[in-house]
Amino acid sequence: MSNEEINIHEAEEQLSEQEMLRRQKLAELQEAGKDPFDVYKVERTHSSADVKDNFEELEGKEVKVAGRLMSKRGQGKVVFADLADLPGKIQLFIKIDNVGEEALKEFKTFDLGDWVAATGEVFKTKMGEVSVKVTSFELICKSLKPLPEKWHGLKDPDLRYRQREVDIITNPEVKDTFIKRSQIVKAIREFLDNRGFLEVDTPILSPIAGGAAARPFITHHNALDIDMYLRIATELYLKRLIVAGFEKVYEMGKNFRNEGVSVRHNPEFTAIELYEAYADYNDMMEIMENMIAYVCEKVNGSTKVTYEGTEIDFTPPWRRITMVDAVKEFAGIDFNEIKSDEEAQAIAKEKNLEFPKPLDKVTKGEVLNMLFEEYGEDKLIQPTFLIDYPVEISPLTKKKRGNEMFTERFEGFVYGREVCNAYSELNDPIVQRERFEQQAREREYGDDEAYMLDEEFMSALETGMPPTGGLGIGIDRMIMFLTDSSSIRDVILFPTMKPQK
């Protein structure tokens, strides 16, 4: 016996009784010249929704429907069956008088999960259900694996994420979530396109991981013999397009960060960044709150949504609060009274705050930010713009007009979670280089999420970038709120999972 034959034999031993029976049925069909895998195309005339929505027009007329067999009922001379397609399901009525004895017998051998095409007349049963009175049918795909038990579906979260296709088949609400996700993404594009923004594509592989404070994925380009990074943000390339003269640009796509996995974080995630010439962070606030209101109305019919039992009101305007005021409100510490880094470090020590570098290297602004994260972030339930971040943690941002300790930066928070980040973009190349050099020192102190110096971006900035507003939004997190999903994995079709042993 060859190694290949041994492997096949071992695989067969691992099959369940149901799987073996299904393979036996397939072999019998193939022997009879009815191989379902020889079907190349199905001339479906109507979906389940088409038939139901247009019953008065279609009653008594012939249609051809197709879908996955989800249930069978009845014996003897009549069988009822449900076919599921994307919009929903349609009931089939298979009677011996209409299809013949042999065909009815064949239909009864079909397994749940099989794909079937059926032709027949549209009618309504005595129970009032719109159905198809089948005159002919065809098995168009044989399911060799049984679906999870009907009434329990696929409930184990780990299995649901690993076998998303089965999850969608057995849990219709999961399918609805991803249909809504598509609608949300479409509405975001629609809003920006209507405002004159141009959608662009920038590199996913880059020689520099720039535009955000995050740990990147590193790969190697064999032909060029250089290390490259999966992008952590699209910011620097998009700003180069503003330099080029594109006045309103956006990109929606995947970013990658080599960091932890949690209910809020997936290493591969969808984000959108947009940049507008001649605008500032106030304009970005207006865009953010009006875009989300537009999307909510378009997809949910209201600017109010319920998330984990709490009503969230996305009606503009959102609350605005400075980071200093938030720390004063939630931590009881007035940073207007803190005059030095040493005073801030003493507070950090008292509060047991942890930093990725020695405490004596930590600045006043970094302590302020950490205090907000510890005491204020989870308190911002209703949509809120936290504005005016310390300059030390905002290396790509212009300083605040009238107060050079801070920058014109905001982050949007909903239900205690960050959903967006925006700036009045720094366009002074001399100051920008100084900021990058400071970030290089942060990396020396052990902060591997500090920004890298990108000389190509610096060259572009030296060519001249007009005053610009920029906004980045975590699409997955926004979708969580609009679909009432508690985990980011619930809104990503195939989330990152640890391989099974």
Swiss-Prot record:
UniProt-listed SUPFAM superfamilies: Class II aaRS and biotin synthetases, Nucleic acid-binding proteins
Cofactor: binding details: Binds 3 Mg(2+) ions per subunit.
A Pfam family the protein falls into: tRNA_anti-codon
UniProt keyword list: Aminoacyl-tRNA synthetase, ATP-binding, Cytoplasm, Ligase, Magnesium, Metal-binding, Nucleotide-binding, Protein biosynthesis
Binding site residues for Mg(2+) 1: 411, 418
Cofactors (names): Mg(2+)
Record: residues binding Mg(2+) 2: 418
EC number: 6.1.1.6
GO biological process, one term: lysyl-tRNA aminoacylation
GO molecular function: ATP binding; catalytic activity, acting on a protein; lysine-tRNA ligase activity; magnesium ion binding; transferase activity; tRNA binding
Catalytic activity: tRNA(Lys) + L-lysine + ATP = L-lysyl-tRNA(Lys) + AMP + diphosphate
Enzyme class: ligase
Compartments where located: Cytoplasm
HAMAP family referenced in this protein's UniProt entry, alphabetically: Lys_tRNA_synth_class2
PANTHER family the UniProt entry points to: LYSINE--TRNA LIGASE, CHLOROPLASTIC_MITOCHONDRIAL, LYSYL-TRNA SYNTHETASE
Subunit text: Homodimer.
Protein name per UniProt: Lysine--tRNA ligase
Species assigned in the record: Clostridium perfringens (strain ATCC 13124 / DSM 756 / JCM 1290 / NCIMB 6125 / NCTC 8237 / Type A)
Phylogenetic lineage: Bacteria, Bacillati, Bacillota, Clostridia, Eubacteriales
